[in-house]
Amino acid sequence: PPSFILGSSFFYKKGQQLDVGVLRTNLVQAGYGSVEQVMAPGEFCVRGGIVDVFPMGSQAPFRLDLFDDEIETIRTFDTETQRSGDDIDEIRILPGHEFPMDEAARNAFRSAWRETFPGDPNKSVVYKDMGQGIAAAGIEYYLPLFFKETATLADYLPADTLIVLSGDVNQALTRFHTEITDR
């Protein structure tokens, strides 16, 4: 839902005060992984006064250079060479997943799973992985177990947006429905 995306997004700009410990906690709770060297979206690395982060949806990762607890510069960088690139004034970091991964959310997911699906939940890899904080492949199909209300793409668009459908929409919907029910 838009409320989750907005509530789990972070904005940083040059000159801003930054508590690296809070940043690290926020990134982990938003679904980012702490690594030795940032190479792919959803990863971050803290080395002294340097924070590298590759936001979801971004074409390039960013390097925040800190002077004490203030963001001195924000630059893009090359993952292969690790060389800094363009200077940026501010960045937006979106959540790493479309769903929360904190302990309360994982517990709510598991509770909703038990209410929704019959049988022993411990026989499900998805259920067990979520208990360990692992987002299994295809977890996004279980989004309604994380939220009381979900959203569609249309919920993010202005009310007067014109939507044009091309091709055989009914066939695509039938194929998608079959794929989902076969899981």
Where are these regions (language model features)?
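ASCE RecA-like P-loop NTPase motor cores
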Residues: 1-183
